[in-house]
């Protein structure tokens, strides 16, 4: 599962997801991409599940790029604990994804196979997505 090796602060504030993505909105590495249409926290488990689904369908042909990284720790207090007594311990890691962000890219496979692989990956994610083709793609 994806997570940072080291972090400056063990616990972070939740923050808010305002506006659209400013960076990572163009398909740059591959020929096809999966674009987020909604804001969300994507967990490292969801990223891994989507990656596995794509790899299985593509039968390890082509190449996949993961363009998001879970660098935000989400804390949780233990069950049946009273309120107060500090912030809970980090439980899992999330990537903050805003609308317009390219989350996954693929190359080296036909368009139909990439589209189906991204459809299977999108089922593993909690947001609406769209299949994107690089503008200069010659299929």
Swiss-Prot record:
InterPro entries: Ribosomal_uL16 (IPR047873), Ribosomal_uL16_bact-type (IPR000114), Ribosomal_uL16_CS (IPR020798), Ribosomal_uL16_dom (IPR016180), Ribosomal_uL16_sf (IPR036920). Keywords: Ribonucleoprotein, Ribosomal protein, RNA-binding, rRNA-binding, tRNA-binding. Residues 7-17 have a biased composition (Basic residues). Residues 1-21 are annotated as: Disordered. Gene3D superfamilies: Ribosomal protein L10e/L16. The keyword Lipid metabolism does not apply. GO terms for biological process: translation. One of its GO terms (cellular component) is cytosolic large ribosomal subunit. Belongs to the universal ribosomal protein uL16 family. Part of the 50S ribosomal subunit. This is Large ribosomal subunit protein uL16. The gene is rplP.
């Amino acid at each position: 599962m994806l997570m940072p090796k080291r972090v400056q602060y063990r616990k972070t504030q939740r923050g808010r997801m305002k506006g659209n993505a400013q960076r990572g909105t163009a398909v740059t590495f591959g020929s096809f991409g999966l674009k987020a249409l909604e804001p969300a926290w994507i967990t490292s488990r969801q990223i891994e599940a989507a990656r596995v689904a794509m790899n299985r369908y593509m039968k390890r042909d082509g190449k996949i790029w993961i363009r998001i990284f879970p660098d935000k720790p989400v804390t949780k207090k233990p069950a049946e604990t009273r309120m107060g007594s500090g912030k809970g311990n980090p439980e899992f890691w999330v990537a903050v994804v805003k609308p317009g962000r390219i989350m996954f890219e693929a190359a080296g496979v036909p368009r139909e196979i990439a589209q189906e692989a991204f459809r299977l990956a999108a089922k593993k994610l909690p947001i609406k997505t769209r299949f994107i083709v690089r503008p200069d793609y010659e299929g």
